[in-house]
Curated annotation (Swiss-Prot):
PANTHER family: COILED-COIL DOMAIN-CONTAINING PROTEIN 39. The gene is CCDC39. Its main location: cytoplasm. This is Coiled-coil domain-containing protein 39. Residues 868-942 are annotated as: Disordered. Belongs to the CCDC39 family. GO terms for biological process: axonemal dynein complex assembly; cilium-dependent cell motility; epithelial cilium movement involved in determination of left/right asymmetry; inner dynein arm assembly.
Amino acid sequence: MSSEFLAELRWEDGFAIPVANEENKTLEEQLSKLQDERSSMQDQLRDYEDRINAMTSHFKNVKQEFLFTQSLCKARDHEIESEEHFKMIAERELGRVKDEIQRLENEITSIREKKNDKENSIFKTTQKLDGLKCQMNWDQQALEAWLEESAHKDSDALTLQKYAQQDDNKIRALTLQLERLTVECNQRRKVLDNEFAETLSVQLELDKAAQDFRKIHNERQKLILQWESTIEQMQKRDKDIDNCAVALARIKQEIREKENLVKEKIKFLENEIGNNTEYEKKISVADRKVLKCRTEYQRHEANRIQLKDELDSLKATVNRSSSDLEALRKNISKVKMDINEETARLGKIKNHNQIVRKKLKEITEKTMSVEEKATNLEDMLREEERGVKEVEVQLNIVKDVLFKKVQELQTETMKEKALVSEIEGTRSSLKHLNHQLHKLDFETLQQQEIMYAQDFYIQQVERRMSRLKGDINSEEKQALEAKTVELQKTLEEKKSALCLLETQIKKLHNDLYFTKKSNSKYRDEKQSLMTKINELTLFNDRSEKELTKAKALKQDLMIEDNLLKLEVKRTRELLHSKAEEVLSLEKRKQQLHTAMEERTEEIKVHKTMLASQIRYVDQERQNVSAEFHERLSKIDKLKNRYEILTVVMLPPEGEEEKTQAYYVIKQALVNNQMEKTGRSYEEEYSFVPMRIYDLVNQVQEINAWCCMSVPRSFQKVTPSSAEYEVKIQLEEQKRAVDEKYRYKQRQIRELQEDIQSMENTLTVIEHLTNNVKEKVTEKQAYVLQLNRETEEQKPKLERVTKQCAKLTKEVRLLKDTKDETLEEQDIKLREVKQLHKIIDEMIVDITQENAEIGVILQTYFQQSGLELPTTSTKGSRHSSRSPSQTSLLSARSSKSTSTSASQTSIKVLELNFPASPLTGSTSRPTSASSASSTGKSRKTNK
């Protein structure tokens, strides 16, 4: 600097250089001190201005937050008012429902009283009819005495006619009154139905209004929650802005401090730039070679992976085809075994029928007359032929069902193959696409590195050209400053755009969540409506059934009325004939004989009618019991399957039972934690490039300043110098920053991949849980349907049991016995054997479906000293029927009663399975055999 200045002044070398005096030196020192004070004061002024701006912005944010909190408080007050209103509406609805329940209970009590009155009247009329029948069954002596008295009193006949006419008039009046009452009842029922429909419509309207109010209330709550979340976000952002302002002031101070250090070290940096360029050229050549090698390696690796995937897919197809072939073979063998078992069963049944026929012939020849033998044999033959036909029909149905199931299995296997092939194809295509993506990412990184190298080289060339030309770099500096300002503006715009996009994404997520909620609500409403429709259809079916029953009862009453009228007419004719033929005793005897013959014929007809009714009732009872046993077996199978599922899904020992919601919540918490860590890494990563960019700008400014003020020094720097050590430290810092930057990038990628995998697993778990929920709902609906059917069948079963009890009483009266007959014992034994057979089949099916339950059942049966039934025991049970039935049909009653009593005693076996999660109260106390046996014992007691 001094040499240049002297050259400009044309100072000769021989003369001494002029130096400032002491006054000038003091002035220069004062000037430098004042300049330092001025710079420090300017720095303080800038700091104060920044603080003032930060405080003003903070004050604005506080005001806005205060307004938001006030509006939130108002919204909360409105919400509390709406909640209170909603509570009042619910209380009113509850009161209305209680009144309705009370009204229904009163109606039920009144209907019960009416029913009791009707039953009492029916009982009284039956007693009267029994009295009339007893009066009709007079002895012959009483008739003769009455005839002798009637011969003396002819006027009694006229009085009887008068009474009969009066009875007819009364009957007509009663029938008219009954018709009038039925018309009134129908009218009242119509009025009641109309009122019921009106109340239902009003109730539906009220329900709709309540639902609309609930929807509006929920929407308002959602808006308030959104509002709260926005306020929280704004508060967080305000805090972040404050922190950023403090950090910015601190960074500015640090920058000012570092600027002084950087100015001193620029000279050393410029000397080393040339060496760095040469080394960078060499490094770029080596990097290109490495990139070529990497690309070749990746290409070979991709080919290897593709070939491996193809090999795996071929292996999977081979394994699948072999498993399908084995499954088809197993199905064919199973079908053949079933056909052989059914044929053997049919042969055993035929042999059993022949043995029973022989035994029946022997017994009937001993005990019955010729006519009764013929009728009974014909009836037995018809029943046996009917049973054989039913067995054949069942065999055909089973064969058709088996054929259909085989066809369905084949179609399902074909579908499964197609789906597996599609999945494998999509997997291979996915792998190929992922490989292409990695390849493209790698290529982009290579291109970016090349671009950076080229840009750096261009900048160096431009600097050299400018230095060679000798241009002043003030314009470049201004241009760079303008560029920095523009870039900062663009950066702020992009930041604002990013914030807007994030808010829009959050809003879209919230909208998506609300739409999903509304869809689920609509589905629930649809399900509730469907259940209501089903209940209405069931109500209609029940009402139709009750109507048919009422019609049948009315027809029976009409028939009984007609029979009574016929009997009355016959008695009148007898009275008239006997009154006219009092004198001739022979005619009287003949008339009595004819009356006795008619009476015996009527008794015979009545007996035949009773026998036919007994047969019909027996058939109905057998059908009802068969249906009831089938449904019980279905329910037990479903319960067993459900218990197996719950056992499989139970947690291991020592751990608490975890529900599906627990896993969903756990997954959501993990996702939230991963998202938070990802955001923190992204924030750190966003600050790193900004710092690098600032450092690059600073270096460029330093270079420009060096070009302006300081001439380039051509002296070489020694390794022992301080500048060389500073350069090494700066290079180490740069390397550390680069390594941190790469490490953070790698962590961000790993976190993104982890988040993606967790989201995929979450979707899979949600899909599985939805499938399980659908299955559970289907099973629950099926169980409810079965329960309804059983409840509908209960009254039928009670009626049938009552009819059976009446018929057994009549049969015992006919046979003059109070003990159980052989037929009753035979029926009970057959029922018990049928029940044993159903239980054995259920146990065999369960053991075939699940081997673990088979092992558990084996242990329980061994503990109780019983044998576990297998497929072989099914056939043996059929063969063991014939000797038991022949022993029952033998003539020795004492032995038959003892065998029936021994066979009806069923051994109860307790199976303590683990508790199911849905019931949760107790484990299943007894097996299906014990439950069904207790049910049978109750029937027999009735």
